[in-house]
Design a protein with these regions (language model features):
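Membrane-embedded alpha-helical segments in integral membrane proteins
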Residues: 1-12, 32-36, 117, 148, ...
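Periplasmic/extracellular loop-to-transmembrane helix junction in inner-membrane transport proteins
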Residues: 1-20, 40-45, 73-128, 339-359
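N-terminal signal-anchor/first transmembrane alpha helix
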Residues: 7-76, 153-156, 218-226
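Hydrophobic cores of alpha-helical transmembrane segments in multi-pass inner/ER membrane proteins
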Residues: 23-30, 93, 193-197
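Short helix-capping and inter-helix turn/linker motifs at the boundaries of alpha-helical repeat units
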Residues: 31-32, 88-90, 269
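Residue-level preference for alpha-helix termini and adjacent loops
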Residues: 68-72, 83, 98-99, 324-329, ...
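Alpha-helical transmembrane segments of integral membrane proteins
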Residues: 107-383
Length: 383
């Protein structure tokens, strides 16, 4: 079968990623132009490590956004004639090259790698955001008030953290568990926290202005109930909000495993920051505890939380890859990176490059997050 040269392979690779390169140029131009107004993110301009990490992360973000433009084939498109072909093999019928070759079912590895980034970037950051909302909602009052509730919550957090994470994930996403109501129950509990946190933020700001507080509460409850019904019960009357049951199962498992760590971090930061002079000044002004937690303590804890969020998304990405490698969670034909590695690892001796696309994608994304976290840590330490 006809193949293109190595130079043509890389030329096609970079050409197909044109929307990504253009988006990266615009993003970094905006970063350098408005760096003085972007806070800690703008400070990354003076951190080469942080810029490299941000470049890698944004590469995959834009790759996921423009996957339909970048990919040459559909992620599930098969061709029995082109199974396990090396990089650069040309599809004679279409005249289109398989940039990184094909897998055992004749699916384009480059296209599946690009579409796989959508799955990772859909689940990992979103689950970490919910985990942070859960950890912040419980960690702020626990660290601020202390008492028996703090003791109970700390014990439960330590209990969850004592489990090996891989074993915990296996127990939560096993096929038998997916068929029960446990994922929906867990998701139902976790998705209550964003609503509770939004209510807490509004109350802390407008507790003495009922003309603003009550309408704001009503809006939050209405929008929250709509999103809640779609995400947890797949019962959105408008049909706009829904999530695949397999993804919901993984989502709930990620939040369950990540929330205790966030809780402990927020609790520790709260116990430290509440002793600062500006918190005492807020108490002297007569500010309530919820105002102090939301508007005095939380903003001053943002540095460690931002750094930890980058590391946590990378950690969750590795866990998702591990689950996919063991065939857990996602559908067997899913183009997520872990499943791709699992599906191609048996043919390394026949086609040594067959596992490289998914492996390098997973490794580079996690590396980018770690470098970005290092850069943010350096800049937050300077502040």
């Amino acid at each position: 079968m006809e193949q293109i040269s190595s130079f043509e392979i890389w030329y096609t690779f970079f050409y197909q990623l044109s929307p990504v390169w253009i988006s990266l140029f615009i993003a970094f131009s905006a970063l350098f132009i408005w760096r003085k107004n972007l806070g800690i993110l703008g400070h990354l301009c003076s951190s080469p490590i942080g810029l490299v990490g941000l470049f890698i992360v944004l590469f995959w973000v834009f790759g996921a956004i423009f996957a339909d433009l970048v990919a040459l084939f559909e992620p599930f498109e098969q061709s029995g004639r082109y199974r396990r072909k090396p990089p650069g093999t040309i599809n004679a019928e279409l005249g289109i090259p398989y940039i990184f070759g094909t897998d055992t079912l004749g699916r384009d590895l480059f296209s599946r790698m690009i579409y796989g980034s959508q799955i990772v970037l859909l689940i990992a950051p979103a689950a970490c955001v919910v985990a942070y909302v859960v950890g912040i909602t419980l960690g702020l009052p626990s660290g601020y008030f202390g008492g028996r509730s703090d003791t109970v919550l700390s014990f439960l957090a330590n209990l969850v953290l004592a489990f090996p994470v891989i074993l915990l994930f296996y127990l939560l996403v096993a096929p038998g568990v997916r068929e029960t109501m446990l994922p929906n129950i867990m998701a139902g509990v976790f998705f209550l926290f964003p609503i509770a946190f939004a209510l807490m933020v509004v109350y802390s700001r407008f507790s003495e202005r009922l003309n603003v507080l009550i309408p704001s509460f009503n809006i939050i409850i209405i929008i929250g109930s709509w999103l809640y019904s779609g995400l947890v019960f797949n019962a959105d009357p408008l049909g706009l909000v829904q999530i695949d049951p397999n993804e919901l199962n993984i989502f709930a498992a990620v939040v369950f495993a990540s929330s205790p760590g966030v809780f402990r971090l927020v609790r520790g930061l709260t116990m430290d920051i509440k002793t600062r002079d500006y918190v005492a000044a807020a108490m002297t002004r007569g500010e309530g505890p919820f105002f102090i937690m939301i508007w005095e303590i939380l903003p001053n804890a943002r540095g460690p939380l931002i750094v930890d969020s980058c590391l946590r998304v990378g950690y969750v990405t590795i866990l998702l890859g591990t689950l996919g490698f063991f065939g857990l969670g996602m559908e067997p034909e899913s183009p997520d990176w872990g499943s791709m590695i699992n599906q191609t690892r048996s043919y390394i001796r026949l086609v040594p490059t067959i596992v490289l696309p998914a492996t390098l994608a997973l490794a580079s994304f996690v590396l980018g997050l770690n470098l970005l976290a290092d850069g943010l840590r350096e800049e937050s330490a300077k502040d």
